[in-house]
Amino acid sequence: MKFSIVKATVLTAALLAVTLPIYKLKAQSKKLLFPEAPGIESYTFRSNFTKDVPATLDIIRNLGIKDIEFSKLYGLEQEALRKMLDERGLKCSVFGTGWNDVINKTTEVAVAAKALGAQYIHLGSIPHKGPALTPGDAQNAVAEFNRVGKLLKTEYGLELLYHNHGDEFAPYENGTLYDYMVQNTNPEYVSFELDILWAYLPGMDPARLINTYPQRYKALHLKDLKKDVARNTSGKTDHDNNVVLGAGQIDIPAVIKAARQAGIQHYYLEDESSLALEQVPLSIQYLKNLKK
């Protein structure tokens, strides 16, 4: 009997030794704001992709990243790129391309996106003749977004995302051209991908934008702006003004909290700097240490 009691006591202690750390880890994970690895925008490693696509995919996989937003195919057929992704347990959720392709070659873009396994097609700029985006440009874009977005959704099961680049935040009526675009596109067919640097640089608060339009965002580009860079409405800044998340001007925790509250599912690191290989691991670590 004594032996059984001792044996049971030892067994209980052993089980506690194993289970308590598990409970502790679960409790800790509940306190973390961003415990998972983010996705990445292929533009981050553009020079690497241009030289060696398989090796660059290996770098991404070794960083613990699973989801990639591709902004181009780097000379490959989409089926070949998809095979490389599948072999590494990677996926492409967003396929990005330019205005002319999305608007005038919609079927080709949709076929490529479907082959890659993407859910979304990202469009990153609006053409304009003058130095600045005009209300007429924005109105034309809204009409085209609604038209193409409906086609992509009804014919291919894809969703169109518009990605801001700064000039959309010019004042217009009681808000900005960006407000006009969000408010006049059909949410059934058109959603948005918020690039937080290109919203912050012209004077916007990315977290406030998410809180204002919580149902319209499906993805974020996560990046930070060097501390000594003045904010401006030019829509331009040096690539090396991209710094490690948390080392710059943007309130990253506020952005992530707003995005979590809004239910945004896709987060892509986009580091445009020449130091991306060194900075991306640090940005990932920063995100993993964020507390609620």
Could you describe each region identified by the protein language model?
Residues F45-K51, E69-E79, T97-K105, K129-A132, ...:
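Acidic-and-aromatic substrate-binding clefts and catalytic sites of carbohydrate-active enzymes
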Residues E155-G246:
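Acidic/histidine-rich catalytic cores of soluble enzymes
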Residues T9-T19:
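Bacterial N-terminal signal peptides
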Residues K2, I22-Y120, L290-K292:
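N-terminal pre-domain/capping segments
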Residues I40, I60, I68, L85, ...:
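Conserved, mostly hydrophobic/aromatic
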Residues E36-E41, I68-F70, C92-T97, I121-L123, ...:
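Hydrophobic faces of well-ordered beta-strands that scaffold small-molecule active sites
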Residues M1-L11:
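Bacterial N-terminal signal peptides that target proteins for export
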